[in-house]
C-alpha cells in the first residue's frame, strides 16, 4: 500500500497538479488585492466616492453585504478573463507548433532515384558549360 502511494505521489500529474494549486492560490490572492485595493476604489471614485466593501442592506437583524458580493463577482471576472487569455495563448502556441510539424512532414523528400537523376542532370549541365 505504501509503495502504491509513493508511486502515485511521485507521478508527474500529481506534482503538476500540486504546483498548479499552489500557483492558483497565490494568483487568487494577487487578483483579490488588485480588485479590492485598485479596481473597486477606482470604480467607487468614478461613481462618486462609493466604498463598495461597506455597502449592505439591513433586513431585520440580518445584514446583506451586497458590496462585498460585487467585489467577489469582479474578482471572479478578472480571474476568469485571465484564465481565458492564458488558455488562448496556450492554444495559439499549440496551433503554431502543430502547423510547423505539418509543414515539416509535408516537405517533399526526394527518392534515391530522384536524387541520382538530379545529380546526373547537374553533371550534364556542368559538362555542357565547360569547353
Curated annotation (Swiss-Prot):
PROSITE patterns, per database record: MSCL
Any matching Pfam family: MscL
SUPFAM superfamilies: Gated mechanosensitive channel
Membrane-crossing segments per the record: 8-28, 30-50, 67-87
Gene Ontology CC terms: plasma membrane
Key word Translocase present: no
Compartments where found: Cell membrane
Membrane-related topology note: Multi-pass membrane protein
Gene Ontology MF terms: mechanosensitive monoatomic ion channel activity
Entries under NCBIfam families matching the protein: mscL (TIGR00220), PRK00567.1-4 (NF001843), PRK13953.1 (NF010558), PRK13955.1 (NF010560)
Assembly mode: Homopentamer.
Protein's job: Channel that opens in response to stretch forces in the membrane lipid bilayer. May participate in the regulation of osmotic pressure changes within the cell.
Name under which the protein is recorded: Large-conductance mechanosensitive channel
Gene designation per UniProt: mscL
